[in-house]
Amino acid sequence: MAAIRALQQWCRQQCEGYRDVNICNMTTSFRDGLAFCAILHRHRPDLINFSALKKENIYENNKLAFRVAEEHLGIPALLDAEDMVALKVPDRLSILTYVSQYYNYFHGRSPIGGMAGVKRASEDSEEEPSGKKAPVQAAKLPSPAPARKPPLSPAQTNPVVQRRNEGAGGPPPKTDQALAGSLVSSTCGVCGKHVHLVQRHLADGRLYHRSCFRCKQCSCTLHSGAYKATGEPGTFVCTSHLPAAASASPKLTGLVPRQPGAMGVDSRTSCSPQKAQEANKARPSAWEPAAGNSPARASVPAAPNPAATSATSVHVRSPARPSESRLAPTPTEGKVRPRVTNSSPMGWSSAAPCTAAAASHPAVPPSAPDPRPATPQGGGAPRVAAPQTTLSSSSTSAATVDPPAWTPSASRTQQARNKFFQTSAVPPGTSLSGRGPTPSLVLSKDSSKEQARNFLKQALSALEEAGAPAPGRPSPATAAVPSSQPKTEAPQASPLAKPLQSSSPRVLGLPSRMEPPAPLSTSSTSQASALPPAGRRNLAESSGVGRVGAGSRPKPEAPMAKGKSTTLTQDMSTSLQEGQEDGPAGWRANLKPVDRRSPAERTLKPKEPRALAEPRAGEAPRKVSGSFAGSVHITLTPVRPDRTPRPASPGPSLPARSPSPPRRRRLAVPASLDVCDNWLRPEPPGQEARVQSWKEEEKKPHLQGKPGRPLSPANVPALPGETVTSPVRLHPDYLSPEEIQRQLQDIERRLDALELRGVELEKRLRAAEGDDAEDSLMVDWFWLIHEKQLLLRQESELMYKSKAQRLEEQQLDIEGELRRLMAKPEALKSLQERRREQELLEQYVSTVNDRSDIVDSLDEDRLREQEEDQMLRDMIEKLGLQRKKSKFRLSKIWSPKSKSSPSQ
């Protein structure tokens, strides 16, 4: 009896000094309800006006106490005011259980985590108490079945909370009167069976088993604050249901309305372009971190352009990672292009893992995959499995990321190239394999070759007469070229020789110099335009590398010098041979095709070696790193001293490359190109506008005044097909709906186990009343009730978490739409827009207030929770049950609390 006496003593202390309140037992002393009101007034005098209460008003007193405790403290009404009036001796176990919740609340925390105050609707408060009194309606009706007929009070989320806490309160059948009352008040409104104290749940005047209180539509157990009443008496439904989630509790869906988009992780990781498109359509404004490798973001429709097919593309294919070398979409990809992203530190790479078949574009025949171990006739270092940097003129590059429209620089480049060449000069594979150029990639036979060759000869002769500028000093004309051409590892030693690394220069048809300027090629410009800044720079550099003969080294310059008397073709072959000997085998073998630039540019090119050796003021020489894994990973790094280009011996070849007229300089570096820090950054107007608008939006003051507030999904100018996720989901404490559901299901299982134990323990308690074993059983009962409270507390915290996350996402959506409306001048706003703006403001304020309420409630709970462990320990010590400590380890009991705290 020590446990009961200890609780009784606590009640006596709390009620001391209150008139008409005398705690001499745990039954009749509480019948008039004044004791309950006194305890509440002692701790919360603001909730009850005790001086206005009268001892004879039994029903009103009990009703007031039960209502206040439920609405403001979150303590479920386990007792019924009508039962207290009807029974001369109230059920002792019910009162003990109910009062123990008062004790726990004022010494620790609310059984249900203090959710009631936040979730309960104030207008329903008066009817809720009566609802809690299932016995009231039941008492009026002859049988449990009719008990359903009385009209239900307005839907209230709070009752759920009550049921979850501790349904314990039906008067036990101790006496005839008690039995009569308990029979009526302890019957489940769904199954019609007896409801034990530990199973009791009162909602809107009906008593239910906790396990019977399920959603009518999805049959999921209803959770605190996540259900509503229906037009049919005694039936409730979830506020929202999880989409096709059988095991998930419906309440979670309501908390995560944006779930279809929330699962953006799935949509953005999907490997199928079609799936990515579907996901994008489903949530156009969803916030998801743009995955660098997401094909969805690359779904910028590529405008088919005949010129694009002839554009020079850079294919870097590493034998170890062939799947990454696909820059061109497979024919089946439709408009979804693999996006080129700066996925690796080495540079830009094709980030479309889904485009498995994109290894080569249809326009590029077998020549594209060209793993040729054999070295060209030059006999340079064997290019065995060196990563192939194939600069292939094909639509692959353009197809990789086709911009919505040609940029000015790209269009001019295309025109210039078309002027000199009808088709690409060299097939991607010819450089290494030595096999003849493929029909699709080779220049239209002699016509284009001879035309370019003749033009170059004339230009070179004119340059020789004019003379070349000092070796270390790039002329203004050439200075422009280096900027467009990133400093390759080998300062484009004879551009003629190195670009064409094919076994025979004849196969190439034109020396790399003779080919149209690769940097200006439509493919490179189109790619760069569609890429992010980093990606565009790397792409532009890769194009420049192609022109320069990326794999060539300073040594090729010597061949160029002595080749002054020889034809360009011979000079090229000589330089090629030497370049192979000195330069990396893989680079030379693969980079030959890039050199397709206009003759004018090639004439400017001779000076590039010097320009590379001495970059423009403030610029450090750069080289193309030879190591890359898969898809074009081209990075510019400072040239090592030993790799700085040696000034080529003065010879006709160098003089021939003396500064060209300004017009040629314009050809090499179009005015439309933004040359910054040696990076070519052509951007399509559409993308520039989007990026600029995005930056402007970020600079705008946020409605909340939070400088770091992320843009809402509705306000972010997402690219076509781009999927983004809400910033809320990026928070380290964010719990996905699936994780919350998993934890709730785990709590559900543990609650079921506790209820089974509680049913057996209740039977033993009623059978052992007055025996010596009663005190020990009562301690066990208190512990069981407390464990249940802990589980319900975890459940309420999860619900808090879920609701808070939903409100935060909702706030972002409202904020984005509101910001757009407020950005519009008042004079231009329509009446409908003004109304919508006002409505959004009200919603915004309401959402913020709801979030604040949740935070305040949780803070209050934390303060109470800090004392709970010690208070419970003191209670056990007062009972003199030290032997129980080994059985009831506090570490075990409080482990759920420690687990639930991180979820906050």
Curated annotation (Swiss-Prot):
One GO location term (cellular component): cell-cell junction
Gene Ontology biological-process entries: actin cytoskeleton organization; actin filament polymerization; bicellular tight junction assembly; endocytic recycling; endosome membrane tubulation; neuron projection development; positive regulation of protein targeting to mitochondrion; Rab protein signal transduction
Annotated region (Mediates interaction with RAB13 and is required for transition from the closed to the opened conformation), positions in chain: 807-903
Keywords, sorted A to Z: Cell junction, Cell membrane, Cell projection, Coiled coil, Cytoplasm, Cytoskeleton, Endosome, LIM domain, Membrane, Metal-binding, Phosphoprotein, Tight junction, Zinc
Entry-linked SUPFAM superfamilies: Calponin-homology domain, CH-domain (SSF47576), Glucocorticoid receptor-like (DNA-binding domain) (SSF57716)
Top-rank taxon: Eukaryota
Subcellular location: Cell membrane; Cell junction, Tight junction; Recycling endosome; Cell projection
Region (Forms an intramolecular interaction with the N-terminal Calponin-homology and LIM zinc-binding domains-containing region keeping the protein in a closed conformation): 698-807
Stretches with biased composition (Polar residues): 267-277, 408-433, 564-578
UniProt-annotated stretches for the region Mediates targeting to the cell plasma membrane: 261-697
PTM annotation (Phosphothreonine): residues: 644
Record's keyword annotation contains Phosphoprotein: yes
TM stretches of this protein: none
One Pfam family in the UniProt entry: LIM
Modified residues (Phosphoserine): 110, 143, 153, 249, 294, 494, 504, 598, 649, 658, 660, 726
Keyword flag Iron-sulfur: no
InterPro entries: bMERB_dom, CH_dom, CH_dom_sf, F-actin_Monoox_Mical, Znf_LIM
PROSITE patterns: BMERB, CH, LIM_DOMAIN_1, LIM_DOMAIN_2
Chain intervals with Low complexity compositional bias: 293-314, 349-362, 385-400, 459-480, 520-534, 542-553
Function of the protein: Effector of small Rab GTPases which is involved in junctional complexes assembly through the regulation of cell adhesion molecules transport to the plasma membrane and actin cytoskeleton reorganization. Regulates the endocytic recycling of occludins, claudins and E-cadherin to the plasma membrane and may thereby regulate the establishment of tight junctions and adherens junctions. In parallel, may regulate actin cytoskeleton reorganization directly through interaction with F-actin or indirectly through actinins and filamins.
Subunit structure: Interacts with RAB13 (GTP-bound form); competes with RAB8A and is involved in tight junctions assembly. Interacts with RAB8A; competes with RAB13 and is involved in E-cadherin endocytic recycling. Interacts with RAB8B. Interacts (preferentially in opened conformation) with ACTN1 and ACTN4; stimulated by RAB13 activation. Interacts (via calponin-homology (CH) domain) with the filamins FLNA, FLNB and FLNC (via actin-binding domain).
Written domain comment of the UniProt record: Exists in a closed and an open conformation due to interaction of the C-terminal coiled-coil domain with an N-terminal region including the calponin-homology (CH) and the LIM zinc-binding domain. The conformational change is regulated by RAB13 and RAB8A. Adopts its closed form upon interaction with RAB8A and interaction with RAB13 causes conformational change from closed to open.
Protein name per Swiss-Prot or TrEMBL: MICAL-like protein 2
Lineage, highest ranks first: Eukaryota, Metazoa, Chordata, Craniata, Vertebrata
